[in-house]
């Protein structure tokens, strides 16, 4: 019996030294056994408590990491794009003389949502639709737009070249506004103000007066490389869709551009980058790119988050945009530029 007790205690508490000869007083042995078992049970309880505590810490850490991952993924998700992609015919389209009524009519037939036009002020204060300050490239004549009246400019023929099927003439902005107003199904215009010298104020005032006269603010968009022109239009009509136009020869975009009171940013194709599209999207600022000629690049830009394709080929852009929309059913904040969803 003594030997059995000795072996039991040795197994229960190997570190304890027992008497070589068992005490004939069984009460002493029972006390020893009870003490050893209490210590062992205490040790086992502490060990298992520590294990469960470690497991609890691990479980809590796992839950915390999962929660953090979900938060990060949710927080890093870009905001929805402001409006669906729009097709904008650059100066109308390439298939007729630029900035003329036939070019805009053709752009409309090819599915453009808007036709981009350039507006300057003639010598008699009339907003006319022409890009260059001199007519040498278009007409082969050394004629300054700012030094000529609207009637004189309209009388100068613009010979057809390239894809154009007919000669053109320089229209007034009013003539194009009347064309848009005549049919609500016709595309709108993206009017770019191009003031010369110190002519920003009179040009902006003349454009404002005409658009108000025809009540077409909701069907037009406006932009300029001249910040005064942008601010003038936006201050007069906060509800109009007004953007800033940036070009690569001006250098890198100023970081202050994100503080401009504008509805969109139009950039030259060479300025477009993933960083720029991410920044614009984080600011909920639609990004338009000009001028895009290649269908593959059009699709690439849409996938990057560009929502305005300004192109000489509105037919290409229409096909690319429609195919993209068919495969991408994302939600947008607005139904169209300046229009609630």
Where are these regions (language model features)?
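Ser/Thr/Pro/Gly-rich low-complexity linker/stalk segments immediately outside membranes or between
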Residues: 74-95
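Hydrophobic membrane-insertion alpha-helices, especially the h-region
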Residues: 57-72
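Structural preference for beta-strand elements that scaffold enzyme active sites
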Residues: 86-88, 114, 186-190, 219-222, ...
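Juxtamembrane transition segments at transmembrane-helix termini in multipass membrane proteins
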Residues: 1-52
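Conserved, mostly hydrophobic/aromatic
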Residues: 90, 107, 118, 153, ...
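Catalytic domains of carbohydrate-active enzymes, especially glycoside hydrolases
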Residues: 103-121, 258-265
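C-terminal active-site rim and adjoining tail of enzyme catalytic domains
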Residues: 40-53, 58, 243-341
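Metal-dependent phosphodiesterase/phospholipase catalytic core, i.e.
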Residues: 131-241, 283
């Amino acid at each position: 019996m003594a030997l059995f007790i000795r072996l039991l205690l040795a197994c229960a508490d190997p570190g304890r030294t027992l008497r070589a000869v068992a005490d004939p007083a069984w009460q002493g042995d029972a006390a020893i056994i009870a003490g050893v078992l209490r210590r062992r049970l205490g040790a086992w309880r502490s060990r298992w408590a520590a294990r469960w505590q470690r497991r609890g810490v691990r479980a809590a850490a796992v839950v915390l990491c999962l929660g953090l991952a979900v938060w990060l993924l949710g927080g890093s998700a870009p905001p929805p794009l402001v409006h669906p992609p729009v097709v904008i015919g650059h100066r109308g389209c390439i298939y007729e003389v630029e900035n003329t009524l036939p070019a805009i009519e053709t752009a409309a037939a090819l599915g453009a949502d808007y036709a981009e036009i350039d507006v300057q002020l003639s010598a008699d204060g009339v907003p006319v639709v022409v890009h260059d300050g001199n007519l040498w490239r278009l007409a082969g004549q050394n004629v300054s737009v700012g030094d000529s009246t609207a009637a004189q400019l309209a009388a100068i023929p613009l010979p057809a070249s390239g894809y154009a099927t007919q000669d053109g003439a320089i229209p007034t902005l009013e003539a194009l506004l009347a064309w848009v107003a005549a049919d609500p199904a016709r595309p709108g215009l993206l009017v770019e103000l191009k003031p010369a010298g110190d002519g920003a104020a009179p040009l902006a005032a003349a454009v404002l007066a005409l658009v108000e006269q025809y009540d077409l603010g909701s069907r037009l968009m406006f932009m300029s490389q001249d910040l005064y022109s942008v601010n003038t239009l936006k201050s007069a009509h906060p509800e109009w869709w007004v953007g800033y136009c940036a070009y690569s020869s001006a250098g890198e975009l100023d970081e202050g551009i994100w503080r401009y009171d504008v509805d969109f940013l139009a950039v030259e194709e060479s300025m477009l980058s993933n960083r720029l599209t991410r920044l614009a999207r984080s600011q909920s600022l639609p990004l338009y790119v000009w001028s895009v000629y290649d269908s593959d690049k059009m699709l690439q830009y849409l996938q990057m988050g560009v929502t305005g394709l300004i192109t000489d080929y509105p037919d290409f852009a229409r096909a690319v945009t429609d195919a993209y929309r068919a495969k991408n059913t994302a939600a947008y904040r607005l139904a169209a530029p300046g229009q609630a969803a």
